[in-house]
């Protein structure tokens, strides 16, 4: 409590929506961290970055592949700047992402001029994101997990809000059913897992395949080259971030054959 005192609250059912470091999730499945399905990210805010507009920039920089470097407009002349990489890849490459981020900003030929007069206006923050490429248990006796607590981040785009909203909607429905039936057992709440993963598992599997393909440098260079020279190819590739059918195509060898012939 604000005054430093402790209070205990009890309920018939808990919906864990307490984020990446969820205490509720730890009670359900322990302090689980799977390096293959966890993304590590570092971020800071900068003012005075040159060339900013309303575009969300994602750059695949060789020094941190298969990770990426981003520059996002944050309003009021600020930029959200950071790097992200799957934990397993980071450990395998024995790379310090914080040093890599500062190196890209200060030394990389593509970016050092853009940051020449920029100022870092926040500390560098670090966090980990549990990716939805691993089908985790998201229920237990009297407990449902939603959002980042459930580990639903898209492994390709890093986006988690859409799946978080869906999980909240499904959890509310199952919670209502459980309370109406007077049954909050794990067996009853298992329907939440079934419904949630039934909705999102195929798309997350496709995103995971796309993430892995993005780590193949020559293939990524080929795709980017095609996007630069062909409006049709550019439209097809950008669609993979938002369109389920486009994601299916991206994960298929035929997609690259079409790009090659375009």
At which residue positions do the language-model features occur?
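Predominantly flavin-linked oxidoreductase catalytic cores and closely associated redox partners
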Residues: 1-117, 130
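Short capping/connector residues at structural and topological boundaries
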Residues: 51, 63-65, 69, 79, ...
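Short, flexible micro-motifs
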Residues: 19-22, 44, 70, 80, ...
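Alpha-helix N-cap/helix-start capping motif
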Residues: 18-19, 169, 217, 231
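A general structural signal for short secondary-structure boundary/capping elements
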Residues: 59-64, 88-90, 106-108, 116-122, ...
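C-terminal helical "tail/cap" subdomain of flavin- and related membrane-associated enzymes
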Residues: 176-262
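FAD/FMN-dependent oxidoreductases across multiple families
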Residues: 91-174, 180
